[in-house]
Amino acid sequence: MGASPIFYLHSMHEGVQVSSKLEQLQALLAPVVEGLGYQCWGIEYVSQGKHSVLRIYIDKEGGILVDDCEAVSRQASAILDVEDPISSEYTLEVSSPGMDRPLFTLEQFASHAGEQVKIKLRTPFEGRRNFQGLLRGVEEQDVVVQVDNHEFLLPIDSIDKANIIPSFD
């Protein structure tokens, strides 16, 4: 995937602290995004030492333009300045999910059934952490992916990153 952004809702960089930080950011920012008329596709918070990156993915019918990202960035920055949920330096990035869109929720996985995906787990499952194959759908709290002729049920809570693999057929 090269330099393409690949993300999942829960980062384990600092364990539970990052997860609860991410949940706090989601609760704070999703209403802002939705209030501007966009879908909050997902939020990623990555702590990298003294500097962090906060990424907000937005979507809407017909696609996202740079002006859309700018509008969300302005509003999100204002809320973040007032609420101050991140104590360290950070960079705010707002973008569309893109063609290789990250998948964050069971609903997103279900709606992209039939597409090729790349999934990375936090810890190995059946001896592996990386899965690339056909997204079959979801079953309860598991994502079903077919790799070669073998079907894997991957618990959504164990997924670190998941992305659609764009098809150019």
UniProtKB/Swiss-Prot annotation:
GO terms for biological process: ribosomal small subunit assembly; translation. Disulfide bonds: none annotated. It is found in: Cytoplasm. Keywords: Cytoplasm, Ribosome biogenesis. GO terms for cellular component: cytosol. CDD domains: YlxS_C. It comes from the Bacteria. Required for maturation of 30S ribosomal subunits. Belongs to the RimP family. This is Ribosome maturation factor RimP. It comes from Pseudomonas entomophila (strain L48).
